[in-house]
């Protein structure tokens, strides 16, 4: 049995979606980020940077959502793709660029509007560029790394925030197709609902 330490965030949803995709039983221990529970000493013992998600399985604890996805893909033998190098590239693009930049956009536009015109404009433009880059890539690709994989599972929860990104999907037809196809997967529907 797996234990997922999470809150209702895109990074945590990656893991609940993956656990649903591989049909594994798991429990969720909610860490309330708004109350600062991630900074409690007990939690810092399993997450040195005070971040969620964290996954506990048997005698090991894994932190960082990308590392957890790779662990679960290796554990299950699923969703790492036929070309693991390509899958890893797209997973790392999500971990190092897509997620952090959309997260910054969210901070400036949703939590702190009007505090920094420079920040709002910068991250809005970056968010638009991310949407366009993904749309361009998906013109010739059904999924990010060829077949449905942990790269898509990692990226989907961030694009699912498109209504609050104030960008929308209307002008990104390939990204919309990709998003709608993944959104219909039963495991995604169940796993997204943390």
Predicted region positions:
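GST-like domain detector, emphasizing the conserved glutathione-binding G-site
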Residues: 1-121, 135
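Short linear loop/turn motifs
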Residues: 87, 193-194
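GST-like fold's C-terminal all-alpha helical module
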Residues: 97-186, 191
